[in-house]
């Protein structure tokens, strides 16, 4: 039985907060616990901190792949960003200021608390980290925002609460300061019931992530605030600290999400039934699920990117989609469920002694209004099948049955050691240390079961900086698929042109050949693959038309209307330059 940090929202002390710096909501309800009690009792202060965790700690990114090239849209439900019809009202994250106010209240009172200095330091360090996290979530999406570092007092004069936007560079400077201040206060690690809290290693890893993001082409270093050298130094420091703490790549790759708190885990949201659970129904076939479908069905673009066992690229010109599952690296089998895969990753498969089969016995339309149309095989009874013929395996609770899809309890690993390592390697490449960058790629591939080959290069052919950069882009695509990192990568690398070049995302249609008998539930796909034909199919409702304008989001009109001092981004018709 695992003890986990309980990050459920408090019911006894809930501050009602200011929205977007200027809208006064209900006053704080202190009927159950008075403010003086909060800062005189470490347990209540910790409970107050826990609601910050509840609001800001990321969880399973279920369905997020549908909004990138990782997954295909369910029944051709292409979103407005990919259609090119999104507006500045399409993305509103400004509720984050609610969390910032909660944090600022804590920071404004913690130094006056009457419990031990050691406890005050730990609580303050965590709060500073989360303020940096919250501001990064805003600034990375919109550019500079108003920096509110003290809790504003409720008032009927809203003009006293309205603040202009700070420059992006000013915001990032403050984010980095909060991280540095947090790092000084946080312990090297938490233990026992506190495992899962933010510690020094998490803060250092996050600093590396932040600097990498703003050093990348989208923000291009912000005039020296986030240079590649600074990003390299931060990620190198994080890597060395984690190395000293015994962190590292965990093998096998397929067990990272099953073996909780393994050495690869850096930042984690802990789940356990019944205290803290999430719904995974939309991720798995309806035959073994209920109530939802269509999340994170892997795209053919993702499937094709996984390397072969010898490290070479999978190329459609020289290989057949009929045998796309032959001799791939270990990450392919740990992430991708394909027609007849022998990985019984669901309890329902094991109970019914079957594999998942995605083939059709007849197909009437390869490109219907909602996708593939025809008669699905009767072994896997899935009336709402995957449009790509693939399913996601990563971060699935393998212990629950159809009736328990609301009770999934797999920990969500937000930062893995592999990310810190690859952030370090990418920064090494950008600062001219190509040897270190290549060494990191080799480590990542070695853990994935890729063979070193005679030359010991694990199939990596890149030598020069531009080619190594492309190698990192491909490697991150497969290493971190369905972990909520892809859109951030596409934005910071300014790769929307690549998305448009796809025309559409794709899948495959697997059809049983005429005259061939159905397979048995546990037939060996390696011997029956030639009973099927495979056809590449488009999966979007329209061609991808995502605009470069979307690299940085516009400020929603409702937010602008509440504060006349806010200016719209210049890529959305305003005067504010989010790149400064």
Annotated model-derived regions:
Residues 41-46, 50, 54-57, 76-142, ...:
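Conserved, well-structured interaction surfaces
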Residues 420-424, 431-454:
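Active/binding-pocket-proximal capping segment
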Residues 2-5, 14-41, 175, 208, ...:
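Bacterial Sec-dependent N-terminal signal peptides
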Residues 22-77, 149, 180-181, 197-371, ...:
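An aromatic- and glycine-enriched ligand-binding surface/loop that stacks and positions planar moieties
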Residues 96, 174-176, 255-311, 317, ...:
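Long, intrinsically disordered, low-complexity segments
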């Amino acid at each position: 039985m695992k003890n986990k940090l309980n990050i459920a929202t408090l019911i006894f002390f809930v501050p009602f907060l200011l929205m977007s710096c200027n809208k006064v909501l209900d006053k704080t309800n202190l009927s159950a616990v008075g403010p003086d009690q909060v800062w005189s009792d470490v347990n209540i202060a910790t409970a107050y901190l826990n609601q910050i965790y509840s609001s800001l700690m990321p969880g399973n990114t279920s369905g997020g792949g549908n909004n990138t090239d990782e997954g295909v849209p369910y029944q051709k439900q292409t979103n407005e960003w990919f259609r090119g019809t999104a507006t500045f009202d399409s993305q509103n994250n400004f509720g984050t200021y609610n969390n910032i106010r909660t944090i600022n209240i804590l920071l404004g009172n913690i130094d006056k608390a009457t419990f031990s200095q050691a406890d005050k330091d730990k609580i303050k360090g965590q709060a500073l980290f989360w303020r940096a996290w919250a501001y990064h979530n805003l600034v990375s999406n919109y550019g500079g925002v108003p920096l509110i570092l003290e809790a504003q007092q409720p008032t009927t004069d809203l003009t006293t609460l309205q603040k202009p936007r700070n420059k992006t560079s000013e915001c990032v400077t403050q984010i980095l300061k909060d991280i540095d201040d947090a790092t000084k206060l946080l312990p090297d690690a938490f233990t026992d019931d506190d495992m899962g809290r933010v510690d020094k290693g998490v803060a250092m890893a996050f600093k590396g992530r932040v600097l990498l993001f703003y050093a990348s082409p989208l923000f291009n270093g912000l005039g020296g605030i986030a240079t590649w050298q600074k990003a390299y130094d931060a990620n190198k420091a994080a890597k060395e600290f984690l190395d000293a703490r015994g962190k590292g790549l965990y093998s096998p790759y397929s067990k990272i999400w099953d073996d909780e708190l393994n050495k690869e885990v850096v930042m984690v949201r802990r789940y356990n039934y019944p205290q803290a659970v999430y719904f995974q129904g939309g991720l798995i076939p309806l035959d073994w699920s209920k109530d939802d479908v269509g999340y994170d069905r892997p795209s053919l673009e993702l499937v094709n990117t996984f390397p072969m066992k010898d490290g070479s690229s999978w190329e459609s010109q020289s290989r057949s989609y009929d045998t796309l599952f032959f001799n791939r690296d270990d990450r392919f089998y740990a992430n991708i469920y394909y027609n007849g895969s022998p990985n019984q990753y669901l309890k329902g498969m094991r109970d019914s002694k079957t594999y998942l089969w995605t083939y059709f016995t007849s197909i009437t339309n390869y490109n219907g209004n909602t996708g593939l149309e025809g008669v699905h095989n009767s072994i896997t009874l899935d009336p709402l099948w995957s449009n790509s013929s693939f399913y996601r395996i990563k971060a699935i609770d393998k212990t629950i049955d159809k009736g328990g899809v609301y009770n999934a309890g797999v920990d969500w690993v937000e930062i893995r050691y592999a990310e810190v390592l690859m952030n370090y390697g990418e920064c090494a490449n950008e600062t001219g240390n190509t040897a270190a960058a290549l060494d990191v790629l080799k480590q990542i591939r070695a853990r994935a079961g890729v063979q070193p080959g005679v030359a010991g290069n694990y199939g990596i052919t890149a030598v020069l900086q531009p080619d190594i950069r492309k190698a990192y882009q491909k490697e991150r695509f497969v290493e971190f698929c369905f972990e909520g990192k892809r859109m951030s990568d596409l934005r910071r690398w300014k790769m929307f042109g690549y998305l448009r070049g796809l025309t559409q995302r794709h899948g495959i249609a697997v059809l049983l050949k005429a005259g061939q008998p159905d397979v048995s539930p546990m037939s060996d796909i390696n011997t029956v693959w030639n009973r099927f034909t495979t056809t590449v199919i488009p999966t979007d409702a329209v061609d991808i038309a995502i605009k470069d304008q979307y690299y940085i989001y516009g400020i929603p009109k409702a937010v602008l209307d509440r504060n006349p001092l806010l200016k719209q981004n210049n890529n959305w018709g305003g005067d504010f330059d989010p790149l400064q």
